[in-house]
Amino acid sequence: ASTSRPAANPSPPRRTAAVETGPMIYFANDHHGRRDREYRFNYKKVGNSWRAYILRTPSLEGRAPDAAITHKLYDNGKPYVCWNCDVATLKEMQTISKFWADNIQEYIATGKRFG
């Protein structure tokens, strides 16, 4: 005769910290009346640092798109926000990317560089 045993309770799923978000939208501050203020980012943890991959920005309206001027780096052709040190948390990277977007918005309107 076989004895039946109750199914073992599976371990609860382990919660791991997210390493990537889906696309997130930020509407930059604009003091010049520009209509297009939409920026889209995908945040991803790479190694020990968070990155803000740039999915969309408004047109630069003829301003120089150079990576050094617009503070962008590239990972396999995908642009992300350049920052001078590792970023430990998603929240910090979101704050940095908003700062970046607000400064790009000013650059588009006036040509004023930042950094």
Segments and roles (model prediction):
Residues 17-85:
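Compact alpha/beta protein-protein interaction domains typified by the UBC
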Residues 5, 35-38, 99, 115:
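Long, contiguous binding/interaction regions
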Residues 1-19:
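Charge-rich, low-complexity N-terminal segments
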